[in-house]
Amino acid sequence: MQDKLIIRGARAHNLKNIDVEIPRDKLIVMTGLSGSGKSSLAFDTIYAEGQRRYVESLSAYARQFLGNMDKPDVDSIDGLSPAISIDQKTTSKNPRSTVGTVTEINDYLRLLYARVGIPYCKNGHGAITASSVEQIVDQVLILPERTRMQILAPVVRRKKGQHKAVFDRIQKDGYVRVRIDGDIMDVAEVPELSKNKMHNIEVVVDRLVQKDGIRGRLFDSIEAALHLGDGYVIIDTMDDHELIFSEHYSCPVCGFTVPELEPRLFSFNAPFGSCPTCDGLGIKLEVDLDLVIPDENKTLREGTLAPWNPISSNYYPQLLEQAMNAFGVDMDKPWKDLSDEDKKLVLHGSGDTAFHFHYQNDFGGVRDIDIPFEGIISNISRRYHETNSDFTRNVMRSYMNELPCATCHGYRLNDQALSVRVGGKEGLNIGQVSELSIADHLSLLTHLELSENEKTIATPIVKEIKDRLTFLNNVGLNYLTLSRSAGTLSGGESQRIRLATQIGSNLSGVLYILDEPSIGLHQRDNDRLISSLKKMRDLGNTLIVVEHDEDTMMAADWLVDVGPGAGALGGEIVASGTPRQVAKNKKSITGQYLSGKKKIPVPLDRRKGSGRFIEIKGAAENNLQNINVKFPLGKFIAVTGVSGSGKSTLVNSILKKVIAQKLNRNSEKPGKYKSISGIEHIDRLIDIDQSPIGRTPRSNPATYTGVFDDIRDLFAQTNEAKIRGYKKGRFSFNVKGGRCEACSGDGIIKIEMHFLPDVYVPCEVCHGTRYNSETLEVHYKDKNIAEILNMTVNDAAEFFAPIPKIARKIRTIKDVGLGYVTLGQPATTLSGGEAQRMKLASELHKRSTGKSFYILDEPTTGLHTDDIARLLKVLERFVDDGNTVLVIEHNLDVIKTADHIIDLGPEGGVGGGQVIATGTPEQVAEMTESYTGQYLKGRLNEK
């Protein structure tokens, strides 16, 4: 087999017909500036060709179900193995997909509970066991010699009635004696029973004395009793001691029954095991009392019930007042002071009790009717489910939230599945185990108490579970729970979960391609991730990792630096060799950072800020432990901490949502907190995330930043446009007039090929320009509108330099390091990091008030160290204008430049949620209990 992967003539996107040779069975890191062509080489060339070759080996029938498999623009690739891509874009948004299902740990857990689990009565009557006739006989024969016993078959258990038909059947079957409510009597002499009382009726099947030779008779009698008693038998030893057995998993006291234990019982995705109320989702859309009653200090008359405020109609205020008067509820007493009974009436209604309602509308219409009072919760729920109006449904939805299911308490399973425990009476059910962190789950399995027989069955299953949990632990995900919904995971988390699954598969000879697996990972956990990558390599696999992390680059066997610049300035192999060889390469920007010749400097001094704060008290959402946090304004703030320590919960779930509620009247409910102060010191909240700037190819940098409006104005003012009577709209590709109607302004035509991938070809009429020929005849400085859109930002900045209004907006795109993109580049082709910087550019050209609050969650995702240096200059411009910038970040180059650090921890999950350190980077670096401080110290010493 070849020992090299040889790529010849790669031209995908901006790649410039490159040739590169990469060693097989090694850990290879591909790096370079954002937009340099790393992903084009790794994913769009190497992985795409690996996938295409596999799919081509399938039948035409199978290929039609596998989607598009375009042949990448490359001359040849030799030495290619089957390829598996683990990127950040394929996170499942299915609410049924959890960490447990994605990693397949749930499959093994279900098997474990089906094989060694013991059901316990949900009503507290102890363990429920199922016994065969043979097992029951064996247990009875253990009784002491000469023990007198009678074998009873329970035919009626705690049921009202006279049960005459039961006695008739007993007599027909030839039985003589029965026990009724504890008293033995002949069937023929049974008195008439009270039909309003609960009764227990047992048939006396046999009477025996314990001695040698009774096994055969005992077996027959117990078998007959089980048949008569619907699977139950009672052994009465005549000394007030009874043994109750069942051949089903059924509680002998209350009758709670569990079906035969099999894996499907423990699946929330199967009707057999899922909770019947929430269908296995664990959540239900319910009316949220906090949204219905936002202020408990208000009275009913003052409008404490938000949905029934008299904004558009006086119907509900009239209904409420007349109902409250009828039922004697004080309309002028604050909600918090009303009795529980009065609150219940307001919320849930009066049941069947009616009151007289007289209603007159604004047009004079009168309604007199006796009706029950519905209650506001029932009213919202009914209107949400019954209305045909989208507007009404959306209004009602704004008072509802996805809350844990009241039946299964969020565990997703039915009572029968949740009654089964592993590890004895004090053991946990499968729902409780799924709520444990990975670290706690590992500890539980290590100390699991099982009988010798159970150990024999469970050992191979437990090994598989522990192996997978250990892999998750080793890639820094020890804080996650198996019940965590896959849709709530970050890109880095979901990628590392799939990475752990691949390690568990123990495949060899595979080509793995990973996209920044270190995203969201604290420096402390990075070593474990690198060890996991090396373990995959040592199994005989080739790993190509697109990465910017310095530690990962230095741990690689081979480093490929793509560049030298981004976009049209990139697409070449600048350096290819060992990390040490690349570090010595003077042409490589990556090499200069690795060797220390280039670095992001530590600021000489820190900003003092405005002296004002936003302070949150009592933050207690998720794992936050009732903490108080101050965010100083007018500073560059970094919120840090190990993965899972509570950073995103504090910033995204509480701070951001509370500010949005107060400033923007956002209805999204924030996480738990007691109070917040200082919001009056800011006037804008800007959340700059990595979501796309547009969902369609029609959105592009020019339209997003607004510069396209100015460019169209400019074209409309040209002499040619005035002569022809063209207005600004003529130069839009979104509306009829100036656009090409053959492709509706898209510039491309989609051709469906059925068994082959859909093909996109340039429009034959406009040749991809998007405009009709008449529009393209209008020129500004010898360029038509299509040629302007095809310009890179760098070229456009020079071209429009004499026009300040346009030049200023284009310069901001250049300032954030996106000079290589074209003005008309479709938004769908921009990476997350590029989209985030485009949003920053859009903010840069707006006039600053000096009171804005910017939030960025891991802005360094996808950025090279050189890109980070540019990003920091942009963020510093915001702060220098008096604004506040808050970043959630693990990158030490960003953290060391911050004015103020808030470090959470000490660990992830339940071991986190505390404020470990606050202050300048220098102050945090001196705090030994801070993991961030320990790593920061080394970076600060590089001054």
Curated annotation (Swiss-Prot):
Q: Which sequence ranges are marked TM in the entry?
A: none
Zinc finger regions, C4-type: 251-278, 740-766
Q: Pfam families of this UniProt entry?
A: ABC_tran, UvrA_DNA-bind, UvrA_inter
Q: Which UniProt keywords apply?
A: ATP-binding, Cytoplasm, DNA damage, DNA excision, DNA repair, DNA-binding, Excision nuclease, Metal-binding, Nucleotide-binding, Repeat, SOS response, Zinc, Zinc-finger
BP terms from Gene Ontology: nucleotide-excision repair; SOS response
Q: Can you cite an annotated GO cellular component?
A: excinuclease repair complex
Q: Which residues form the ABC transporter domain?
A: 308-589, 609-937
Record-listed ATP binding positions: 32-39, 641-648
- From the Swiss-Prot or TrEMBL record, state where the protein is found: Cytoplasm
Main location per the UniProt record: cytoplasm
Q: Which GO terms describe its molecular function?
A: ATP binding; ATP hydrolysis activity; DNA binding; excinuclease ABC activity; zinc ion binding
CDD domains with a match to the protein in the record: ABC_UvrA_I, ABC_UvrA_II
SMART domains tied to this protein: AAA (SM00382)
Keyword match Ribonucleoprotein: no
Q: Which domain of life is it from?
A: Bacteria
Question: Is Chaperone among this UniProt entry's keywords?
Answer: no
Q: How does it assemble?
A: Forms a heterotetramer with UvrB during the search for lesions.
Q: What does this protein do?
A: The UvrABC repair system catalyzes the recognition and processing of DNA lesions. UvrA is an ATPase and a DNA-binding protein. A damage recognition complex composed of 2 UvrA and 2 UvrB subunits scans DNA for abnormalities. When the presence of a lesion has been verified by UvrB, the UvrA molecules dissociate.
> What family does the entry list?
Belongs to the ABC transporter superfamily. UvrA family.
Q: What is this protein called?
A: UvrABC system protein A
Q: Which organism is it from?
A: Streptococcus mutans serotype c (strain ATCC 700610 / UA159)
Q: What is the lineage of its organism?
A: Bacteria, Bacillati, Bacillota, Bacilli, Lactobacillales
The coding gene here is uvrA
